[in-house]
Curated annotation (Swiss-Prot):
Gene3D superfamilies: Glycogen Phosphorylase B. It catalyses: [(1->4)-alpha-D-glucosyl](n) + ADP-alpha-D-glucose = [(1->4)-alpha-D-glucosyl](n+1) + ADP + H(+). Pfam families: Glyco_transf_5, Glycos_transf_1. InterPro entries: Glyco_trans_1, GS/SS, Starch_synth_cat_dom. Signal peptide: none annotated. Keywords: Glycogen biosynthesis, Glycosyltransferase, Transferase. ADP-alpha-D-glucose binds at residue 15. One of its GO terms (molecular function) is alpha-1,4-glucan glucosyltransferase (ADP-glucose donor) activity. Synthesizes alpha-1,4-glucan chains using ADP-glucose. This is Glycogen synthase. It comes from Shigella boydii serotype 4 (strain Sb227). Pathway: Glycan biosynthesis; glycogen biosynthesis. Its EC number is 2.4.1.21. The gene is glgA.
């Protein structure tokens, strides 16, 4: 079974979000599971520099100009690169300029990505041809459409990492991307009078996956579907929509081997976690005290992530004696709000604006509770890292958060399945009630340690996801 992942980023070569983490880990897990998985990426500068052994496979003149297809390896995974400097050789973000305006030629830049993905199934590399083209998010959404236009030389899977980003472009660009105008149809890639790369992936793929079972159900509902609910409900009825949970890359996220921690530990040596907490309290300007629970946030500061709820609930958390360490950036109003809280509550609130991958490990190793109060969350990786590190997740019941965290209810504690704290409603009162439950459990140290060990024993490895995808691919053949 030969599978080509078509996508726009891959950790650690280039990362703007969780998609990169998935592509950085899933193909390697699939190779270990017996699938010949490779990755197709645009040759953005950081990616091109990272794949040092790239050799020319093919040269083509395309609707988007001349391209060179390269092939090399990164961490044991075969990587195809679309080398087109006029499209991809730009500093900074792969999607927008320094003023945060989307590049005006994004329609060509990402149509080309889908086109090359489909051409791979027609022999662009004469020595390797995929049985399945697995496209990820809107950037690769045209790959299933190009395959359909070519008579489907390979099966296609389209994975939705976040339905909110739809890849919308003016209709006249149909003239530029070499797809038949007949595809510009409500039964095709047309959406609200425009081309939607996302809808192209949803409509033309043989199978759609979402990054958690709950999110796969949620996106059939109007409040989560952004206008795509009719199509997604149809795909669900046809058995062509399912959810596969993302995993944790244990080579990077494991408290037993994490060199970024002051003190490494396992579920059997959790007492060694205390030194990480002490170091984190010092680094964030918090009072060094192992008797108080340290809550943490590692997140984009947006209302989608529920960070406005944290700001509203913060006085209640602090009144009970808790501390907060926050690492993130985003909405300027939220940034100012958290900075003001740090100034008002010195020793109890520490805030670092920005994102630093290394420091996020130190927070995960040192905190007692990781807050993930998202309004919607397709899968979420932060809570999975929390489980792995014995940093109990406090989450809202949505998307992948609902699939991965079991509340510390009396029943779950008795059954030995509790792993965190879950609240229902997207408001500060509901969040505060969950925070209160965390304080109650914290006051029972042996029970807290029991839940930590239970959380750390859960298996969210990429091997589980790789097996699920392998079974899906074989069903499509």
């Amino acid at each position: 079974m030969q599978v080509l992942h078509v996508c726009s980023e891959m950790f650690p070569l280039l990362k703007t979000g969780g998609l990169a983490d998935v592509i950085g880990a899933l193909p390697a897990a699939q190779i270990a599971d017996g699938v010949d998985a490779r990755v197709l990426l645009p040759a953005f500068p950081d990616i091109r520099r990272g794949v040092t052994d790239a050799q020319v496979v093919s040269r083509r003149d395309t609707f988007a100009g001349h391209i060179t297809l390269l092939f090399g390896h990164y961490n044991g995974v075969g990587i195809y690169l679309i080398d087109a400097p006029h499209l991809y050789d730009r500093p900074g973000s792969p999607y927008h300029d320094t003023n945060l305006f989307a590049y005006t030629d994004n329609v060509l830049r990402f149509a080309l990505l889908g086109w090359v993905g489909a051409e791979m199934a027609s022999g662009l590399d004469p020595f390797w041809r995929p049985d399945v083209v697995h496209a990820h998010d809107w950037h690769a959404g045209l790959a299933p459409a190009y395959l359909a236009a070519r008579g489907r030389p390979a099966k296609s899977v389209f994975t939705v990492h976040n339905l909110a980003y739809q890849g919308m472009f003016y209709a006249h660009h149909m003239n530029d991307i070499q797809l038949p105008w007949s595809f510009f149809n409500i039964h095709g890639l047309e959406f609200n009078g425009q081309i939607s790369f996302l809808k192209a992936g949803l409509y033309y793929a043989d199978h759609i996956t979402a990054v958690s079972p709950t999110y796969a159900r949620e996106i059939t509902e109007p409040q989560f579907a952004y206008g795509m609910e009719g199509l997604l409900q149809q795909r669900h009825r046809e058995g062509r929509l399912s959810g596969v949970l993302n995993g944790v890359d244990e080579k990077i996220w494991s408290p037993e081997t994490d060199l970024l921690l002051a003190s490494r530990y396992t579920r059997d040596t959790l007492e060694d976690k205390a030194e990480n907490k002490r170091q984190l309290q010092i680094a964030m300007g918090l009072k060094v005290d192992d008797k108080v629970p340290l809550f943490a946030v590692v997140s984009r500061l947006t209302s989608q992530k529920g960070l406005d709820l944290v700001l509203e609930a913060l006085p209640g958390l602090l009144e009970q004696g808790g501390q907060l360490a926050l690492l993130g950036a985003g909405d300027p109003v939220l940034q100012e709000g958290f900075l003001a809280a740090a100034a008002e509550y010195p020793g109890q609130v520490g805030v670092q604006i920005g994102y630093h991958e290394a420091f996020s490990h130190r927070i995960m190793g040192g905190a007692d509770v990781i807050l993930v109060p998202s309004r919607f969350e397709p899968c979420g990786l932060t809570q999975l890292y929390g489980l792995k590190y014995g940093t109990l997740p406090l989450v809202r019941r949505t998307g992948g958060l609902a699939d991965t965290v079991s509340d510390c209810s009396l029943e779950n504690l008795a059954d030995g399945v509790a792993s965190g704290f879950v609240f229902e409603d997207s408001n500060a009162w509901s969040l505060l009630r969950a925070i209160r439950r965390a304080f109650v459990l914290w006051s029972r140290a042996s029970l807290w340690r029991f839940v930590q060990r239970q959380a750390m024993a859960m298996d969210f490895s990429w091997q589980v996801a790789a097996k699920s995808y392998r079974e899906l691919y074989y069903r499509l053949k």
